[in-house]
């Protein structure tokens, strides 16, 4: 039985490292900085990235570990000989393999944070003089990366209006190398037509990179629509409980190879412990996401009918401008609800001060509901003009809907809005 033929839920649970001689049921934590070699030839071959030496697996035969028939829990192949945990680690490899299977990707690399994934992916693939075409609505740190740091290396970025995808090709130049977007976007929850982006990227021979953080592999798979690479901040819904940081990029093996070589030498690797936590978190991702989305839709419907709310954006609300696109490419609407509170920036601050149950935090995708006012927090370093350019108004509030009893979440938002 091949893992590719299994359901996503089964892949998330049963994709697992080969068992050791102890026949453990749950994968152990490989908390080690480095790995040993059997002899000089083993060491040479490992650094030369030749076929892994299997001397250490002498107890294993074609029927499985210690003669016990191989189960679907032991199906993913050993891709490399582990040398040093900055390069690879069994726990990290397992986590990456799960994401690859769930996203339909050829290969991947895991990072210490989501922004390490974003930076390393771009830095590995771009050269001085290259150009990026990006959606205007992107995460604040990504925007800062594009506008403040990349220009130091003569890498420029042009932004297209997420509500005017027909204008994308107007921004493409001879030196454009990457087309980039988030969908849904952070924090405005705009939706981009991934199929359209895929066609444009293919037509102009561009690398299409999609940040799939808000959707997760359970809700949306951008590679199906033509994306070359998919990025996740695993800190968010993949972990799901606000415990660890992590990021991952998956996609075409030739591009991942470049990202791997860059990251192997610059050191943004995910720690074995965090990889172990994140891999275990994926086992419950489908169940968690179903409940997150169920709660979020009810919260969005409540907010849409509140007199102190000017507007609400949630992908599966029929009032969302890109509702039809969302239904085409997303299985569910996600757990993020964005709404415009009447009264601009001061009203947003007062609303946060009145919150009692929900948490005030810059994170999202937690079991606990989180409320954020982007204009005064995550995007406060942008000018008002820059914020408006990325769909962030002074009254915008982002709610990461958690797993609490949904009526308790609604009651908290209701009293804070009054």
What do these predicted regions represent?
Residues 9-17, 107-308, 313, 324:
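Conserved PLP-enzyme active-site core in the AAT-like
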Residues 1-9, 56-66, 418:
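Basic/polar N-terminal segments that are highly enriched at the extreme N-terminus
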